[in-house]
Structure formats: C-alpha cells, structure tokens
Amino acid sequence: MENNSTKKALELRELPSILTREEMVDIMQREVYGYIPKVDFTMSVSDSEYVYGGYKCNSVEHSYVTMTISVGDKSHSFRVDRLLHKDGKKRPTVILNNFHRIYESRYFPIEEMTEYEADFITVCYTDVSSDDGDFTNGLAPLLLPNGRDTDTTCGKIGIWAWANMRL
C-alpha cells in the first residue's frame, strides 16, 4: 500500500509513463540485443533416445532428441537433452542453455534441480552456434546469411534465444 509521502516523492521525480511490453521489447532489441531474425524455416525432431532413468529415486529420466532446423537448402542439427519426470504429470519446464553437454559435464546437479518438481530441457549453447564472431557455423548462417550486417542485427545471444523459443 502506497502512502502519501511515497506518492508525492514519485510525483516530484516526474518519471515517464510506463511503456507497454511491446515497447520495452523493441527498446531492448534495438539498443541491447539486436532484432531476432524472422525467417521461414522447417523443423524436425528425432525420436527420443533413452540415456538414464535412475535420477531422483528412479522418478526422473534423461533422454535426448536431435532437433533439425532447415532454411532453404541448408540445415543444422543439435542435441536437446531432456530431464523429465516419469509420472507424466504436467510440470513447470525450465529451458536451460548449458555450458557443457550433460553427458560431458563432471557436475550437473540433476538430483538437486529436479527436487523442485520441474522438468528440464537443456542444450549446449555451442551446439546451436559457437560463442564468437563467426557467423558461418551452427544456426548462424541459416538465420543471418549476411552475418551481423547492421548495428541492430542480433548476435549470438539472439541466435541462442531463437533456438530456445523452439525447444
């Protein structure tokens, strides 16, 4: 509950009006991250491959699928690991860009993370596109065939976000 002194203090600051979500997204894309590309694409997902089912007292299974994105005659595939509870209940799902593939990581806290009753979808960000200025590998040449050709073209964060929105 706002008291009168707080309300007066805010009025004295003459703050601008609050922007809409769309206006804020536009500002963040224009000034910080760049615009995420709009491309016509097709997507396919392989059948699930079982990895291990013994997490959290055998209630969480680790599996993966291979996702393929195609734009025109070019395509790129990457592995998407899934940590899903076996009971089939709908749960919150966390999408996680990971620095390592789960099966390569010496420590990935699966037990601790799934303790909070969420499922996890994770991808190693370098499988989507490398973390550098090279726009010729991974999804980069499909989404940005001309590389970063303007100041408002997204970089790798935008490419990773584009992929995450499709997981």
Region locations from a protein language model:
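Short secondary-structure boundary segments
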Residues: 54-83, 140-159
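Aromatic-enriched hydrophobic runs in primary sequence
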Residues: 33, 41, 77-78, 93, ...
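Short, flexible loop/turn elements at secondary-structure junctions
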Residues: 69-73, 84-86, 98-101, 127
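Cap/lid segment of the alpha/beta-hydrolase catalytic domain
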Residues: 90-167
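N-terminal targeting or regulatory segments adjacent to alpha/beta-hydrolase or S9 domains
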Residues: 1-77
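Proline/glycine-enriched tight loop/beta-turn segments at coil->beta junctions
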Residues: 74-78, 83-94, 115-116
